[in-house]
Amino acid sequence: HPLIVTNTGIRQGADSLRFQLTVWKNMMPGPSKDRSIQLSLDVISEGLDLTPLSLDSVHVDFQRPMNATWRVRFSAPSEKRDGIWTYGALGKGLLWSGTGSIRAKIFGRYDGRPFVHDAWTGRIQITH
């Protein structure tokens, strides 16, 4: 099951961007250590022009109980369509069972100005 979390992004006066991050598991057969995750980043404009927006990378931290942490960097989006950036996962062994926490940062530029959006912190539950 994907985890979908929506947060508010850049604010410029009354205009803003909203980021909707969807994380899902790679359910290809095989050992769990060879599986990975993917995400799509849906950018919803709330009165802000999307033309000057470019997204460079998304850094996602997964934290399990017992302080076991995985970090994965999503960069070079494989697809950009209608304000949706799709990223493939880098890294292995990211599929686990149980409940943990997840944190994401979005790196990009708007109108040539760099920004880092500490997007969201949430809980994720993976059942199988």
Predicted regions, residues:
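Short intrinsically disordered, low-complexity coil segments enriched in acidic
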Residues: 1-4, 41, 76
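A eukaryote-biased signal for short, well-structured alpha-helical docking elements
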Residues: 1-18
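A structural signal for short, hydrophobic beta-strand segments that form beta-sheets
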Residues: 7, 21, 55-57
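Contiguous beta-strand segments within globular domains
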Residues: 17-45, 51-52
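A generic structural signal for short beta-strands and their flanking turns/coil linkers
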Residues: 35-39, 56, 100-102
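Short, solvent-exposed, Trp/other aromatic-anchored flexible loops in extracytoplasmic proteins
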Residues: 44-50, 64-118
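Short acidic, flexible loop segments centered on an aromatic residue
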Residues: 53-64
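Short beta-strand elements
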Residues: 114-128
